[in-house]
């Protein structure tokens, strides 16, 4: 009887896929749902201030849900899956290279509300998967900016002006890889690149999980 009871509890409380609700694999994102994520062509997506920007995946339903769940719905264990998706894409461009990974920072007020910076979590998993070095102290967000998604390109740049502060003492001397979840106009990457170049850091590459221009 006790064995039946524990099996019943396992059915109720076993971890379910956040996407299809299957408990077969007892993971947050089952292999079928992960495999449904589609990569963009493996090439440079755009150039910002002379720096290469790569966008890993098509802005599909599952990738949107993955990012939003991690970012807004306290699904912190989804960070591994986003990091894995990005790492598997980026390995095609980074053979024999070592990067200093810098996640896009969020303001302390927003981090307090969310309980974490989702891109720091992604950065930790990304570096664990790739062997790169994580640096969350090089760039700090000192301005609590408005959400970018409803703003035009010019408004985004104005909104981000003065948003970031660089701590040069925290630079470890490596090639910088800035990572973010979504690259729309590229304004966030551009502002961070500008600030890094002001202190002489010019060896920079950017990587986002997706861009809404490909759905």
Residue ranges of model-derived segments:
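Glycine-rich phosphate/pyrophosphate-handling loop used in enzymes and phosphotransfer proteins
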Residues: 1-215
């Amino acid at each position: 009887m006790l064995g039946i009871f524990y099996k019943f509890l396992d059915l109720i409380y076993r971890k379910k896929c956040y996407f299809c609700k299957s408990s077969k694999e007892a993971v947050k994102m089952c292999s079928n749902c992960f495999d449904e994520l589609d990569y963009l062509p493996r090439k440079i997506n755009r150039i910002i201030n002379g720096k290469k920007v790569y966008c890993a995946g098509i802005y599909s339903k599952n990738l949107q849900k993955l990012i939003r769940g991690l970012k807004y719905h306290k699904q912190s264990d989804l960070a591994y899956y986003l990091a894995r998706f990005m790492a598997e894409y980026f390995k095609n461009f980074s053979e024999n290279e070592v990067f200093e990974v810098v996640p896009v920072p969020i303001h302390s007020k927003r981090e307090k509300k969310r309980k974490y910076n989702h891109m720091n979590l992604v950065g930790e998993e990304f570096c664990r998967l790739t062997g790169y070095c994580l640096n969350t102290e090089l760039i700090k967000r000192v301005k609590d900016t408005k959400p970018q998604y409803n703003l035009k390109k010019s408004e985004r740049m104005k909104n981000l002006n003065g948003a970031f502060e660089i701590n040069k003492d925290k630079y470890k001397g490596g090639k910088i890889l800035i990572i973010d979840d979504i690259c729309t106009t590229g304004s966030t990457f551009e502002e961070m690149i500008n600030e890094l170049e002001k202190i002489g850091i010019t060896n920079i590459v950017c990587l986002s999980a997706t861009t809404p221009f490909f759905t």
